[in-house]
């Protein structure tokens, strides 16, 4: 079961800063893992309608690892024929160049906006499925993301 840390209504800001868990300050020397759930009320009960990716972020005072500052992509768009493949080439720009990125999960995670047009593997291999266009999202461990446009002819 999910632990609710903070509820935000649609009219509120799109960003939220959480500084305490269970009335205690967050230890900034440790890594943080979290995700966001969006829900709506149906017959007086909360029904989850969306879930963000889970992020793994280094605490601000962590001296052993760092987070991604941004993601650099070799290409930001691909035009493919149905059935053809392409591989995403990406690199991370670190906040602190001397420290490694959190490495207990893969360096990059991928998602597609429309799996009928193109799918992407956990290794970043894009496969064109059907005619149309979609976006492929490349996520770093801390949720930093870049978007790639894919057109399938």
Protein language model regions, located:
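Local beta-strand/beta-hairpin segments that build beta-sheet-rich folds
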Residues: 3-6, 49, 145
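Short beta-strand segments within Ig-like beta-sandwich modules, predominantly Fibronectin type-III
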Residues: 6-12, 117-120
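Generic beta-strand hydrophobic packing signal
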Residues: 8, 52-53, 71, 76
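Short strand-edge motifs at loop-to-beta-strand transitions and within beta-strands
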Residues: 14-16, 124
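Beta-strand-rich modules
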Residues: 18-44
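Glycine-rich, flexible loop segments associated with nucleotide phosphate handling
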Residues: 28-32, 49-52, 101-109
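Extracellular fibronectin type III
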Residues: 43-61
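Extracytoplasmic soluble-region selector
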Residues: 61-153
């Amino acid at each position: 079961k999910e632990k609710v840390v903070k509820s935000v209504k649609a009219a509120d800001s799109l960003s939220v800063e959480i500084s305490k868990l269970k009335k205690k300050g967050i230890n900034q020397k440790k890594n943080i893992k979290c995700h966001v759930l969006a829900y709506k009320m149906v017959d007086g009960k909360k029904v989850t309608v969306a879930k963000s990716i889970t992020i793994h972020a280094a605490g601000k005072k962590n001296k052993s690892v760092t987070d991604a500052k941004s993601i650099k992509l070799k290409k930001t768009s691909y035009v493919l024929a149905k059935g053809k493949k392409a591989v995403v080439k990406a690199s991370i720009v670190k906040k602190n160049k001397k420290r490694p990125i959190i490495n207990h999960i893969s360096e990059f995670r991928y998602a597609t906006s429309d799996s009928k047009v193109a799918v992407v593997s956990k290794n970043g291999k894009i496969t064109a499925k059907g005619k149309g266009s979609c976006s492929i999202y490349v996520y770093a461990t801390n949720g930093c993301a870049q978007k790639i446009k894919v057109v399938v002819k």
